[in-house]
């Protein structure tokens, strides 16, 4: 199961279900991606305003760090579910 192609509603429904996955680790991965997306948004807003030029340097760095976390968060969410599914199957 990969969570990257699911809608928010599908992920939330799966999280609320009685299945063992997704669980907290997968939710944390998705939250990481969402936090990174917000960091990119604020960086882009800052970079688009001449009046905030003094913050451009740090905004560029924040965006550089946050962009890879968009995909990493989803990858970690999927890895967590797959790992725990393997544990459940072993019992």
Annotate each language-model stretch with its function.
Residues 1-3, 8-9, 57-58, 63-64:
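Mixed-charge, polar/low-complexity N-terminal
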Residues 3-21:
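Short, hydrophobic/aliphatic alpha-helical segments
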Residues 17-40:
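Conserved phosphate/anionic-ligand binding catalytic regions in large, soluble enzymes, centered on
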Residues 50-91:
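A structural-propensity feature for long, helix-poor, extended segments
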Residues 41-53:
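Transmembrane signal-anchor/signal-peptide helices with a preference for the extracytoplasmic
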Residues 7, 11, 34-41, 76-79, ...:
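Amphipathic, well-ordered alpha-helical segments in soluble domains
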């Amino acid at each position: 199961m990969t969570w990257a192609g699911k809608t928010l509603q599908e992920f939330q429904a799966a999280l609320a279900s009685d299945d063992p996955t997704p669980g907290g680790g997968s939710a944390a991965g998705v939250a990481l991606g969402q936090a990174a997306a917000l960091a990119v948004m604020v960086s882009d807003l800052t970079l688009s305003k001449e009046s905030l030029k003094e913050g451009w340097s740090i905004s560029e760095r924040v965006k550089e760090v946050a962009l890879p976390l968009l995909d990493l968060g989803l990858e970690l969410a999927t890895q967590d579910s797959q790992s725990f599914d393997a544990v459940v199957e072993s019992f």
